[in-house]
Amino acid sequence: NIVITGMGGSALAGLIVKKWLENEITLPIEIVRNYNLPKSVSKNTLVIASSYSGNTEESISALTQAIEIGAQVATVSSHGKMEEIARKNQIAHVKLPTGLQPRMAVIYNFRALTKILVNFGINSNEKHEEIEHYADFLRKESESWAASVSNERNYAKQLALYSAGRSAVFLSSSAFSPLA
């Protein structure tokens, strides 16, 4: 089994990975948003502890438990205590870019989680490369959302202007439920 620990945007990235891969891998993925790992965690479990700051108490607590259990462990953070623990224990660590708001780091976290699953032999590299393709597309597409782009050519501005003073309701298929 696979356990991804995290709060806020880190948990959101885990939920997206879980949905993205639910028909691709046979191992169950559980997202843990608290201090304690489930009793099902064993030496055969892959525990990925994620915290943008690297200092989230809940994620560090779960990481410490995973190390004590002897689970397979990887970490994701921009810096902080989590990175220090990973270095000290020779644990695989993916370093996220610094200087972002944690929610803005979700896409980086998502990519890190999928790459860890590739490195542990759980996910195919082709599926990870698919993410890179979408990231390139979104990078180019988002240029049209810049403040300097006129309203006529900027769908983000048009949506914002249309939505002003209204309540937003987001509907989604289950595939996109973590994003809704």
Residue spans for each PLM region:
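Acidic catalytic cores of enzymes that act on phosphate-bearing nucleotides/polynucleotides
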Residues: 26, 156-180
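Glycine-rich phosphate-binding loops that contact phosphosugars or nucleotide phosphates
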Residues: 1-143, 161
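A short, well-structured juxtamembrane/interface segment
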Residues: 1, 149-162
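A short glycine-/small-residue-rich loop at the edge of a beta-strand within enzyme catalytic domains
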Residues: 125, 129, 150, 174-175
